[in-house]
């Protein structure tokens, strides 16, 4: 059935596309599953409490993920909640994440930052936060695990502001913590919501709501907690930043919520506030202008490629974020980088291994299409009567490096095919020393688990056994101005190595940050970057 422009506009207005970022074990996967639970997308939230839990989280599906109880790949999940169509971009939250995690943030219109209430701001959160800042997208904070002993909430807010450099505005406030976690106070409705923990966190919880200053609240949470709450309200109203939505949309101010994803304390309250505050699909820059999401013509970009999601399928899926207009199954589009028109058949939306064929989708949605090997990260697709390119997705600096070669030299062809395909998906980056061939390469990854993923996939999907020799380098920099400097004549340190990527762009490897600074000092005019351009 054809739709009017007004109907398409209404569909787009109701889209919300966001990523959830966190340090390992801060509760990101649990929060994601509770969102899906409230949206009716799953009936029972899969507990990820223990690494050896028999039930695996909904978003874990690769063999290596099942063995470890972690989420190696970044999945996209869609559900509906109170009139909103929500796309969650799930990012790996375990000890070793990949460049995929960074790239997923390129498809998000906002981010939810999950922080462990007992630990505060941690290393991986800082890295992911920097990418959100680079994109100027709104960042909402959920301080989790208040069902356990947690740090002082004022102290946590100070740490967010000092370490991350973003101002905060608490939207709700915790009443107690640990066994004495009574509920949350909403600073804008002036209501206290108390909770009864659900068994195993599996079902929606019953809630009660009271005016903060009434005797009903005091009788439920106790005199001491009630007095503390009244003092906190007075202090927050006088000292905290006001909720200025212009500052929120620019990424200068983060609304903060407290709760416990495991026991559902504060989760639905957070979800409701967040959906009202966060943006519908945002415009996106092209090389020549900007594409408005409400433009009737379809456009999208590829931000992730996943091969062999299911051995029964032996397939490769390109995930794309729709930027504007309406998508219809079977429509013909321009694949700009490929230089030809293609037909997008059997588009899918995913819930882990479960695939659903979609007939239509709108700006803000994430769809997966079968990739016969023609797509690369950052590719633009647009209506057949259009031709433009979205700004490329940057290549992020790996932090771990290894020399990789095949054991059986007769399998060189399979080795080259395998590493190239895995690199094209964006799981690894391939580098070479100058004057060497592909029989021995240097692989760079953002998280060391990707080395395990690489050897596992080469063995299982390409029947190639490899020897992997880890290298001591931790820093890599692209030479930004190779036309102005002779890379071979750069005055380096004893630990510096000159390499190139598959596009012959020159790069430098270093063991420590001191060497990076020293090389810049010794070579006036040399420009180095942590990001490569695609």
Report residues per predicted region:
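Structural and coupling elements of P-loop NTPases
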Residues: 1-534
């Amino acid at each position: 059935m054809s739709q009017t422009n007004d109907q398409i506009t209404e569909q787009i207005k109701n889209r919300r596309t966001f990523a959830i970022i966190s340090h390992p074990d801060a509760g990101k996967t649990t929060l994601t599953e509770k969102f899906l639970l409230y949206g009716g997308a799953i009936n029972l939230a899969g507990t990820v409490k223990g690494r050896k839990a028999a039930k695996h989280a909904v978003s874990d599906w690769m063999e290596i993920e099942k063995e470890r109880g972690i989420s190696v790949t970044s999945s996209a999940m869609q559900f509906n909640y109170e009139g909103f169509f929500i796309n969650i971009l799930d990012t790996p939250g375990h000890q070793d994440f990949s460049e995929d995690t960074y790239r997923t943030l390129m498809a998000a219109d906002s981010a939810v930052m999950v922080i462990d209430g007992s630990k505060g701001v941690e290393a991986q959160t800082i890295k992911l936060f920097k990418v959100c800042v680079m994109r100027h997208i709104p960042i909402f904070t959920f301080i989790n695990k208040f069902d356990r002993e947690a740090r002082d909430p004022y102290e946590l807010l100070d740490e967010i502001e000092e370490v991350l450099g973003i101002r905060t505005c608490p939207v709700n406030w915790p009443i107690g913590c640990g066994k004495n976690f009574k509920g949350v106070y909403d600073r804008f409705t002036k209501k206290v919501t108390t909770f009864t923990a659900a068994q195993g966190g599996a079902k929606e919880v019953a809630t009660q709501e009271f005016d903060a200053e009434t005797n009903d609240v005091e009788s439920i949470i106790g005199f001491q907690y009630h007095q503390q709450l009244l003092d906190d309200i007075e202090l927050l109203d006088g000292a905290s930043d006001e909720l200025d939505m212009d500052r929120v949309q620019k990424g200068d101010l983060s609304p903060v919520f407290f709760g416990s994803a495991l026991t559902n304390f504060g989760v639905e309250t957070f979800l409701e506030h967040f959906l009202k505050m966060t943006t519908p699909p945002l415009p996106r820059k092209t090389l020549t202008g900007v594409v408005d999401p409400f433009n009737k013509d379809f456009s999208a970009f590829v931000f992730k490629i996943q091969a062999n999601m299911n051995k029964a399928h032996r397939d490769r899926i390109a995930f794309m974020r729709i930027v504007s207009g309406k998508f219809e199954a079977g429509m013909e589009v321009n694949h700009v980088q490929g230089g030809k028109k293609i037909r997008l058949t059997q588009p899918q939306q995913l819930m882990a291994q479960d695939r659903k064929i979609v007939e239509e989708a709108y700006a803000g949605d994430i769809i997966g299409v079968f990739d016969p090997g023609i797509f690369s990260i950052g590719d633009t697709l647009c209506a057949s009567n259009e031709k433009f390119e979205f700004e490329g997705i940057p290549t992020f600096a790996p932090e771990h490096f290894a020399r990789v070669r095949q054991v059986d030299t007769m399998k060189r062809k399979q080795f080259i095919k395998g590493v190239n395909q895995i690199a094209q998906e964006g799981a690894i980056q391939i580098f070479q020393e100058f004057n060497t061939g592909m029989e021995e390469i240097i692989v760079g990854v953002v998280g060391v688990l990707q080395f395990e993923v690489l050897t596992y996939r080469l063995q299982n999907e390409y029947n190639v056994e490899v020897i992997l020799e880890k290298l001591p380098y931790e820093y890599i920099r692209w030479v930004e101005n190779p036309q102005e400097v002779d890379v071979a004549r750069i005055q380096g340190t004893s630990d510096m190595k000159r390499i190139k990527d598959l596009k012959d762009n020159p790069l430098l490897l270093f063991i420590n940050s001191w060497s990076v600074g020293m090389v810049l000092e010794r070579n006036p005019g040399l420009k180095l970057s942590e990001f490569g351009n695609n």
